[in-house]
Amino acid sequence: MTDWKQYGPIYTIAPGIKKLGKLSIIEFDNEEERYLKLKKKSKENIYYDNLYDNKIDGKIVQKIKSILSQEYPNKNIAFQNFKEIGYSIQEDIAIFHRSNKLIGLHVSFPSLWIPKEKIGMSFSAIHQPVPGMEKIIENEKKYVDMMINAEQPIVRYVWGEHFSYLLSPLEPIDKGSKVIHTERQTFIGMPEDDLGIFLIKKKVMLFDDTDIEFQQWYKNQIISMSEDQKKYKIGI
C-alpha cells in the first residue's frame, strides 16, 4: 500500500486537490492481472444515467485511448466502449456531466458505498452523507466546474478501512481482520464536451501488516475526528 503520507497529520474532509505532476494519469502496476480478473467477476458494477448516450461514449473512448497512447505506447489495450474500458484498466471510473449529474459508473471496488444508489445524482447528493462536507456542498458548482475544466488532470487522495475482504468481496478474509484502503482519485476534464472523467485507483493492506509509523499516523487521524466522522469513517 502506498500514498497514505499524502493525507496530512490529522483527519480532514478538505479536498486536498493537487496537480498531477509527473504521475501517470492511468496507472498499471504489478497487480494488474489481479485487478482485471476481479473486475470481470464483479456484478452490479456498471450503471448509466439516461443522459449518457453513444456520442458521449465515443468521446470517453477517444479520450482514454489518447491518454493510453501517450503513456503506454507499446501496451496492447483494445476497447470500443465505456464498458470495455473499465475491464481494461485497474482504475474504477465515473463520468460526471456539467449539468451536475453523475451519468456513468464502472465501479468494482467501491469503498463502503453502493454504485447503483449514486447514478444520476448531483455532486451535493453524492456527498450529503459525509460529515463535515457542508461548506463544500454549498459550493458544489465551483467543484463541478473544477472537475469539468481540469484539462490538466488533478488528483486527490482519500483513505478508509473495512473488514472481511481485501480488494473486493470476491477476496474474503476473516471477518475480524481490519483492512486499510487508500484511493488515488484523478480528475480529467473535457470542457469542450461538458464532461469529466473521474478515475479511482484503490489499494489495500491488512492493518496488521502496517508498520509503527503508519499506526501512529492512523491513531492521530482517529483522535482528530469528530464523533460523527468516527461513526461514518470507522463505525465507532
Regions found by a protein language model. Give the residues of each.
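Extended, well-ordered protein cores
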Residues: 1-236
